[in-house]
């Protein structure tokens, strides 16, 4: 195993380990990649990917060259761009190729939709490119008809709907040559494990498999041993994940009763472009949203109890700037990339150290400075300490003079 220091890139300050890769599998500028499709290169620059991020520099070439890949990087470092560029490079746009060639799966509708948008935007210069979204909450018959009519090279979706299309033989899984799992740890822990394993059983023996995630629990290593062949491993050790560029603070409270008043005081004190507030339950999200709206704050919400159209409308309106505040359960904690989000507030401290990383990572996207503020009651003190130990960081109390 070879270690490389990340002194050349500010996206992360952690040490990475690259196993199974050599220096020839890395690059520093897009022009270094001689085999890159010129149409794709134009799309990359049009999407403002001027310089490849750390994870892109180390993962794109191994994928392009046919290796299985396990890639771990903290949130906001360009994982979607990494597998998006690689996927667009490996597909064949020959109109005679009518089967789905690449399958990208994510744990939530919102993340799948965003991945579809990124891949589509990166490939705007690639004539004949077709990317289809497969998620729950839409008509399965319409999805099947579109698969038949459009014959997309790339499908992006959630495991449930994807497996349904495979089971119905609307997708010929045997001819898929690349499978990408984004936020794979979340999919394995949130009820998708059986569906993912079922999908693997339908794939051909030579399918290329790539796993991307901010965390790599043991279950992912078990999956890799079952379905991957000598994968290139690009890992950031968990204890070294530092959330570079994000200022982290906590506000100490006696109990939950003082949270809403504290939140109002916070909004009077700090200025922010856009803000995401996380709660630990659907009811908390609904109650807080109602209270914020009654106080005149431009707030909307997303939680798992909403139907697809309502969630999409809220997300699109927030992204467009119609609302400055998004109140959410953990359904948006992974992969949602809105560059205007400068502040994340944990109204409830997350119960998982991994979720803390994903939530706070919604701020400070693509090298921008961000702020994460957590409300911490007396009963949360042990969890706060666990987070600090796990990420080898200190989350200081927000100073009374803080102005953001």
Predicted regions and their residues:
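Conserved helicase RecA-like core
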Residues: 2-10, 18-404
């Amino acid at each position: 195993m070879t270690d490389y220091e990340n002194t050349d890139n500010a996206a992360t300050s952690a040490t990475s380990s690259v196993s199974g890769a050599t220096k020839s599998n890395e690059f520093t500028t897009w022009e270094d990649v001689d085999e890159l499709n010129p149409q794709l290169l134009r799309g990359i620059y049009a999407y403002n990917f001027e310089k490849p991020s750390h994870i892109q520099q180390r993962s794109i070439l191994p994928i392009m060259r046919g290796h299985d890949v396990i890639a771990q990087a903290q949130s906001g470092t360009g994982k979607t761009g990494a597998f998006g560029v690689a996927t667009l490079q490996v597909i064949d746009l020959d109109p005679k190729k009518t089967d789905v060639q690449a399958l990208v799966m994510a744990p939530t509708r919102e993340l799948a939709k965003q991945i579809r948008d990124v891949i589509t935007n990166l490939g705007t210069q690639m004539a004949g490119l077709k990317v289809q979204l497969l998620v729950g909450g839409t008509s399965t018959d319409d999805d099947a008809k579109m698969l038949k009519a459009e014959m997309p090279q790339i499908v992006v979706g959630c495991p449930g709907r994807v497996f349904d299309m495979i089971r119905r033989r609307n997708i010929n899984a045997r001819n898929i040559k690349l499978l990408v799992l984004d936020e794979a740890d979340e999919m394995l822990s949130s009820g998708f494990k059986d569906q993912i394993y079922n999908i693997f059983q339908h794939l051909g023996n030579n399918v290329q498999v790539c796993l991307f995630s901010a965390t790599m629990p043991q279950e992912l290593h078990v999956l890799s041993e079952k379905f991957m062949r000598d994968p290139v491993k690009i890992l950031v050790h968990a204890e070294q994940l530092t959330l570079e560029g994000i200022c982290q603070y906590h506000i100490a409270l006696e109990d939950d009763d003082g949270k809403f008043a504290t939140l109002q005081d916070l909004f009077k004190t700090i200025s922010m472009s856009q803000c995401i507030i996380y709660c630990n339950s659907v009811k908390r999200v609904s109650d807080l949203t109602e209270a914020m709206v009654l106080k005149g704050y431009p707030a909307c919400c997303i939680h798992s109890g909403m139907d697809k159209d309502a969630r999409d409308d809220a997300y699109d309106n927030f992204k467009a700037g119609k609302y400055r505040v998004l109140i959410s359960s953990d359904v948006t904690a992974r992969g949602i990339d809105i560059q205007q989000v400068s502040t994340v507030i944990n109204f409830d401290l997350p119960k998982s150290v991994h979720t803390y990383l994903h939530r706070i990572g919604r701020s400070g996207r693509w090298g921008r400075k961000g702020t994460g503020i957590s409300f911490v009651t007396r009963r949360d003190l042990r969890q706060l300490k666990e987070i600090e130990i796990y990420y080898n960081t200190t989350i200081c109390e927000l100073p009374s003079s803080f102005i953001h």
